[in-house]
Amino acid sequence: MLCPVSHLADLRQQVPFDLALLPPQACLVGGAVRDALLGRRREYLDWDFVVPSGAIETASAIASRYRAGFVVLDKARHIARVVFAHGTVDFAQQEGMSLEQDLARRDFTVNAIAYNFQQNKLIDPMAGVGDLQRGQLKMVAAVNLADDPLRLLRAYRQAAQLQFTLDPDTRTVLRELAPRIKTVAAERVQAEFNYLLGSPRGSQWLLAAWQDGILAHWFSHANLSSLNAIGCIDLAIAAIKNQLTLVERQQFFQALGKKGIAIAKLASLVCADVKIAEGELQRLKYSRHELRSVQAILQGYPQLSCLENSPTVRQLYFFFVELGKYLPHFVLYALAHCPHNYHSFIFELLTHYLNSGDRLAHPQPLITGKDLIDKLHIKPSPLIGQLLTEINIAHIEGKISNEQEALAYAQELGKS
């Protein structure tokens, strides 16, 4: 709900320095003002001030006064940052001859609102407050989006973040400018994708971005089916919460990790061919962990059709070994992509995984390779690994249960 403009005075309580240190014309701009008007309070400050001149000097003086961190971000453009324990405050020299000209260069009207603390005055030349009231994201000007094409993708991210709609004229421009997204640095694009992939509200906006051609360059193999599957992953999360006990839910989400949901969705966006998918992810500068996670999901998925009907212990053993710690990510992906008749089997796999004592998902070796070398005098070779695998499978099947039986079993296998 939109707060009365008078409530902006509450921002004073959050200011981490004496307002008297600000030049009279200094204004807070951007997301901090927008969020205050929406009644959204941030635990960690991320503020931006615009000043007519002396931005670096102002930041330096405040940092010195409070023994805070100080970084010159862009000397040529006169931008500096003060780092406090609970947030950062950036100071930038205004672009243009006036504050209004500076605001006219911003991306969306809701981000082109300024607040002057000393005058307790809101400056809104782009009518951004009205768009906040309408819950609408509207461009300031098409040229502003063209000048920094990352803003094209940011439109969908901010619509998801704020739970806003996109102004129809703005969306038309986004479609027209979509090919320009390929000129943006991969790291910047990845950061925007990560928010959309990691948020339940991001799924519908990823679909919208795909429909508008924004994803075409980076995820050329994405189609309507894969975008719908991303939405189904959100439903899969709800199903998992309903199916598992409280303890199992905690185990699952701990194993999944903070990025697990985003990784399962990412696997839906890339090509199903593992090699092509690797290229797509490397181009976007994804980490080795994210790359390996997606590889495991895509390699494991085709095996489900072979496993669903009476799989052998051997088949399941190798399946769990290959997926390893990525099984929770796989489960999310599989629940979203598989026909419903596979779901009970997928939950069986998850039940095995969540039981730390389950021999199938978490084999407990009876002996080591060193035991085979020392006690059976087997020379180091690939045979060691093969024997250990067969011993693990025999243990799961109940054929052997202790070290002596394992050694005897290995000795017998070595003869054959």
Swiss-Prot record:
Listed cofactors: Mg(2+)
Matching InterPro entries: CCA-adding_enz_C (IPR032810), NT_sf (IPR043519), PolA_pol_head_dom (IPR002646), PolyA_RNA-bd (IPR032828), tRNA_CCA-adding_enzyme (IPR050124)
EC number of this enzyme: 2.7.7.-
Keywords: Magnesium, Metal-binding, Nucleotide-binding, Nucleotidyltransferase, RNA-binding, Transferase, tRNA processing, tRNA-binding
Keyword Magnesium in record: yes
Entry's family note: Belongs to the tRNA nucleotidyltransferase/poly(A) polymerase family.
Binding site for CTP: 31-34, 106-107, 111, 148-157, 188
GO biological process terms on file: tRNA 3'-terminal CCA addition; tRNA surveillance
Function: tRNA nucleotidyltransferase involved in the synthesis of the tRNA CCA terminus. Adds the two cytidine residues to tRNA.
Protein name, as recorded: CC-adding tRNA nucleotidyltransferase
A Pfam family hit: tRNA_NucTran2_2
Binding annotation for Mg(2+): 46, 48
SUPFAM superfamilies: Nucleotidyltransferase, Poly A polymerase C-terminal region-like
Entry GO MF terms: CC tRNA cytidylyltransferase activity; CCACCA tRNA nucleotidyltransferase activity; metal ion binding; nucleotide binding; tRNA binding
UniProt enzyme class: transferase
Catalytic activity, as annotated: a tRNA precursor + 2 CTP = a tRNA with a 3' CC end + 2 diphosphate
